[in-house]
Amino acid sequence: MGQIFPRSANPIPRPPRGLATHHWLNFLQAAYRLEPGPSSYDFHQLKTVLKMALETPVWMCPINYSLLASLLPKGYPGQVNEILQVLIQTQTQIPSHPAPPPPSSPTHDPPDSDPQIPPPYVEPTAPQVLPVMHPHGVPPTHRPWQMKDLQAIKQEVSQAAPGSPQFMQTIRLAVQQFDPTAKDLQDLLQYLCSSLVASLHHQQLDSLISEAETRGITGYNPLAGPLRVQANNPQQQGLRREYQQLWLTAFAALPGSAKDPSWASILQGLEEPYHTFVERLNVALDNGLPEGTPKDPILRSLAYSNANKECQKLLQARGHTNSPLGDMLRACQAWTPRDKTKVLVVQPKKPPPNQPCFRCGKAGHWSRDCAQPRPPPGPCPLCQDPTHWKRDCPRLKPAIPEPEPEEDALLLDLPADIPHPKNLHRGGGLTSPPTLRQVHPNKDPASILPVIPLDPARRPLIKAQVDTQTSHPRTIEALLDTGADMTVLPIALFSSDTPLKDTSVLGAGGQTQDHFKLTSLPVLIRLPFRTTPIVLTSCLVDTKNNWAIIGRDALQQCQGVLYLPEAKRPPVILPIQAPAVLGLEHLPRPPEISQFPLNQNASRPCNTWSGRPWRQAISNRTPGQEITQYSQLKRPMEPGDSSTTCGPLIL
């Protein structure tokens, strides 16, 4: 067979699922007639349309391209509309073609014609398929078969019997594309069919060639050799096409393939939709029936006889047992498979037992149906309580914190609830309340996160002190607005030489206002609940002195929370409060005094000292005399420190 090439992609686009191959070949041949030729995107769009149209296959029995074109959305991308128009024109032109005149017999030739000169070539009758237009409008040229071409053709006809419509449409398309010679057709037959089918085809072809040579073929010269030899000449296009037509006609006498299932074995499933069952029948008949065999009577008969009982009852009730296929599809279109009926197995109910329950000691029920829980076999291994299992031990459940009062809930800086307390390092078992962050001594805790309660009946106004760096600080009443992107200040707060820039502000109603200016000078705003001022690099200036608004740029630096209480009360600013219980990490470190050399006599415990020397020393105190008392001051012990820190007490 020559050099073997690797298997490549199929040169013929594959049809969508559910569409017969010979119908798909009609779409392909119509697409090849377009100028410029179709692209892969056009075939993708065509497949998408056909997949949607196959859900209502009424346009296929018989096939109606005009009805399919009406289902196409307006302005659909690709050349799908052009392909359908070609099919519609061809479908209307096929019945109007006159029958070709019978070929003239050699006995009716004029007496003055020279038998050595062949008669002029007459174009043979085109097959009942769409012609394929090759690139640039040139006629097809002969191309020898390649292994990848033969493999692609065999893959297309692998499920079809020789002589079936799908088989013949694929072979016709391949013949029109490659324009093969007699030798090429013989190679194709040996590659596609078995030896028995090839032998039967050869016998049928010989009889057709003998009949054609006797009848007379346009362009055939008996002195130049048999028709098979003259068809191998690439220059004899007319004779080669005649031979190709005879080669295709010889498939009509071939038997069907024995591997195809019988038509009677294709049955509708219990839950299979009716149109899917009819489509399976249609594809099976296309793949197995010889070309020219009427398919509609067989399809109508099998569509009723092989349907399930429910669809047969619907068709009988509407009188569509042998109606056109479109009426049968409409009759069963609304049918849906019923759910499988569940058979309930009725079991006799056992009488209640007379014996007492092993769990509660009462009669009338079994222990598995007892309402009393099963007692544990022993005490709980965690708390030694014999009344519950280990999985129900209270120690395994997290402690539910008590709800905080309403006032405490407003203080957002209170310690967070964590499951485990914080242990201090060598702190004698002391614990510290968990906090969100460490409060520094030099930082005011009231400036961290304020909660501002507002009255719903009043506007959220607040007094603020504004310092514009060009004039003295002034106190104004500003509006808190979380919907304003920038802070707005009246122009009266700025001096006359303040540089201002023109800008436009888009209001909430969509109107643009131009009486606002933009300043790039830093502005300091002091709020009553914040000790450090807010620094704004720029803000809007109202030239009409109507608005003083604190926007999101200032509120974001405060990190404040606006709170709307339920009860009406005057607005109160709640500052941040420190926790009521402070841990040792919040206190300053105790003083450390060097104790070396250590006085063993002075480091005795205080309870061993007598009061008499102290009274005598205090009563006989002389000016400038210092009495030193050593008291034990406990401090957190450091690693490796076993001494006691003592501090002098000056009286």
Swiss-Prot record:
Residues 93-143, 632-651 are annotated as: Disordered. Its EC number is 3.4.23.-. The modification Phosphoserine is found at residue 105. A zinc finger (CCHC-type) spans 355-372, 378-395. It comes from the Viruses. The record marks 130-131, 344-345, 449-450, 574-575, 582-583 as: Cleavage. A motif (PPXY motif) lies at residues 118-121. GO terms for molecular function: aspartic-type endopeptidase activity; nucleic acid binding; structural molecule activity; zinc ion binding. Signal peptide: none annotated. A motif (PTAP/PSAP motif) lies at residues 124-127. Residues 641-651 have a biased composition (Polar residues). It is an enzyme of class 3 (hydrolase). The active site is at 481 (for protease activity). Keywords: Aspartyl protease, Capsid protein, Eukaryotic host gene expression shutoff by virus, Eukaryotic host translation shutoff by virus, Host gene expression shutoff by virus, Host-virus interaction, Hydrolase, Lipoprotein, Metal-binding, Myristate, Phosphoprotein, Protease, Repeat, Viral nucleoprotein, Virion, Zinc, Zinc-finger. Residues 476-554 form the Peptidase A2 domain. InterPro entries: Aspartic_peptidase_AS, D_retro_matrix, Gag_p24_C, Peptidase_A2_cat, Peptidase_aspartic_dom_sf, Primate_lentivir_Gag_pol-like, Retropepsins, Retrov_capsid_C. The keyword Phosphoprotein applies. GO terms for biological process: proteolysis; symbiont-mediated suppression of host gene expression; viral translational frameshifting. GO terms for cellular component: viral nucleocapsid. This is Gag-Pro polyprotein. It comes from Human T-cell leukemia virus 1 (isolate Melanesia mel5 subtype C).
